[in-house]
Amino acid sequence: MEDGDFRRRPPLWTSYFSPEEVCFLTTVHTLASGSSGNALLLSCGESYILLDAGISCRRITAALRELGLELGSLTAILITHTHADHISGLQTLLKRCAAPVFTTERAARELSWRLPGAETRLDALDFGIPQSIGEFAVTAFPTSHDAPGSCGFRLDAAGGAVGVLTDTGYVTDEAADILEGVDLAVLEANHDIETLRSGPYPYYLKQRILGAQGHLSNEDAARFAAV
């Protein structure tokens, strides 16, 4: 596909928000987390962003209803990467709500191949360039993971700045720069290195998890969080 096959939104070049604009708090709800599925809901004002859809549409719907929301309340869907535990509910979700889907160009290409018809709903984000999505300015940054175009996100709104960094073998320089100064960071802490090495997983899986395109260890996550 050519670049024009995915819609691009104009960047938000401003320095975001003055103190006088703070009318709402940004909130983060974990709908699911772990190897069986991942999904977050971020909200500010009347904007609701679903970040990853790694559980069934039914579970997402039920979780939203517990918060007094419906699928139609969603402003947008953000996808970090195309592994099943982050997109397993996306195809059904696309049939049941009209929210646009934002991800990186390489991930968008993968989704368009794996999910027939999805290409008409995908918006490609460029790394490091903020995009205005509802109340949020969303900035994607690259992660080091074995999925095409994998990324994390910084979301700035009047109610605060949130960074989301999951599924990465290490914290890239771009990630560290973009996440500087956030009010809240949602950070992967996947494993204790020695417990993993001595555990029951097969050798190839241990090597994948420990590799540069695998998952962030508890030690590395703590080290980054302390900076």
What spans do the regions from the language model cover?
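Targeting/processing segments of secretory and organellar proteins
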Residues: 2-4, 8-9
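Conserved beta-strand hairpin/beta-sheet module of binuclear metal-dependent hydrolase folds
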Residues: 16, 20-67, 151-167, 184
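Active-site neighborhood of phospho(di)ester-bond hydrolases with catalytic His/Asp-centered motifs
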Residues: 51-54, 74-82, 102-105, 163-167, ...
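Active-site metal-binding motif and surrounding structural segment of the metallo-beta-lactamase
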Residues: 58-103
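Short, well-ordered alpha-helix to beta-strand connector turns
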Residues: 74, 119, 182-183
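Metallo-beta-lactamase
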Residues: 105-159
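Cap/insert and terminal regions of metallo-dependent hydrolase folds
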Residues: 173-227
